Amino acid sequence: MSRMAEQQLYIHGGYTSATSGRTFETINPANGNVLATVQAAGREDVDRAVKSAQQGQKIWAAMTAMERSRILRRAVDILRERNDELAKLETLDTGKAYSETSTVDIVTGADVLEYYAGLIPALEGSQIPLRETSFVYTRREPLGVVAGIGAWNYPIQIALWKSAPALAAGNAMIFKPSEVTPLTALKLAEIYSEAGLPDGVFNVLPGVGAETGQYLTEHPGIAKVSFTGGVASGKKVMANSAASSLKEVTMELGGKSPLIVFDDADLDLAADIAMMANFFSSGQVCTNGTRVFVPAKCKAAFEQKILARVERIRAGDVFDPQTNFGPLVSFPHRDNVLRYIAKGKEEGARVLCGGDVLKGDGFDNGAWVAPTVFTDCRDEMTIVREEIFGPVMSLLTYESEDEVIRRANDTDYGLAAGIVTADLNLAHRVIHQLEAGICWINTWGESPAEMPVGGYKHSGIGRENGVMTLQSYTQVKSIQVEMAKFQSIF
């Protein structure tokens, strides 16, 4: 693909040049080619995006629920019509296999938008009787202008997960995509405008997180920040949001999730789940179950089943429909993952497979890392304690139920957890003791629009998707009505 035209900001229904004068490049990680130069938003750009959003939000909030619903449904239709086109761009920008982006990224994002478009007319208040002459009623009102800050692993899906409930509730959103993968968020802005969204209701500001993101979190005109990213960055976002104007926050942060295989489990099912929980999207999924706990007596058999499945991984041309494994999103991220792999070897974990870059035709110029499985791991190892965010599975053994629950919970993270067992009594007993916000029994990874997702502990605050997320983009106003004569003590 030839290099794209320089990408601008999207403010008030159209493209506009950044006032900062700064740019950055977005790279195709499959081959190292530059896809485009992208303009970076500065402080003045954030100011004008906020002013634009304030204007647009008033128009948007004044529309009826059905009018807003119809516009968002039109955007859903356009997304589905352009699924393949958007998926190709997402593959170029992220490196993910087209077999994945064409069936997951836009599809699941559009599903969430459709879900919230349908919920808009159901946003309602309540009536609370006090006595015969007085009652209270409540209204759910939009927050105003909110900010979304996205991560690089699911660019358009995250943009939709954040914008759908925000817009459905009558807010305007300023979205800052990751500087690593900024392209499809700009296309989403075009689609919203085409669907009839008033100018300013969805503005997109590409830029460097440490600058553009900080300007957004500190801006007094922003009422809420929804952030997806790492724990360290999330703490900064939260601190800036609180220090500036006590903004509300939603934080979807990292994870080091446990997948527990019990001794009654079908090991073929368990191995299939472990593979999806570690190597889907080349391991770049925040909910991945990278700590795989297996009964000691099942270890050897489980290792063989994992090795057999690793042989089925197909890395290569990301547009080949048979390819199911792509490069990592960037060269700096690849190098970071390789440092973790080296640390695992240094600390005594045994490499069952992988453990290096992929080499040969089609791999040498890209950010490729081989699917890697470590065994003989211990809880104190760096690869077991820290989020790697790459194709690295750690196998650990255990002897008892109480032991594995304790070890599974021995982490600062609490995003996801899963178990594989044929015993549903055991399944529910254990799941109820695991300290994680998203749990799966005999499956892994699905996060449908109806399901609230978010973490415990350092893995986040608040939830995305589900009814409660729509409500989190509103504020409740309580109004008391008195029909009798008011009595004053003065």
From Swiss-Prot:
Top-level taxon of origin: Bacteria
Binding site for NAD(+): G150, A151, W152, K176, P177, S178, E179, G230, V231, A232, S233, G254, C286, E387
Catalytic activity: betaine aldehyde + NAD(+) + H2O = glycine betaine + NADH + 2 H(+)
Name of the top EC class for this enzyme: oxidoreductase
Example GO BP: glycine betaine biosynthetic process from choline
CDD domains named in the record: ALDH_F9_TMBADH
EC number: 1.2.1.8
Cofactor(s), names only, from the UniProt record: K(+)
Keywords: Metal-binding, NAD, NADP, Oxidation, Oxidoreductase, Potassium
GO molecular function: betaine-aldehyde dehydrogenase (NAD+) activity; metal ion binding
Active site per the UniProt annotation: K162, E252, C286, E464
Family designation: Belongs to the aldehyde dehydrogenase family.
Entry function: Involved in the biosynthesis of the osmoprotectant glycine betaine. Catalyzes the irreversible oxidation of betaine aldehyde to the corresponding acid.
Name listed for the protein in its UniProt record: Betaine aldehyde dehydrogenase
Organism: Escherichia coli (strain SMS-3-5 / SECEC)
Gene label: betB
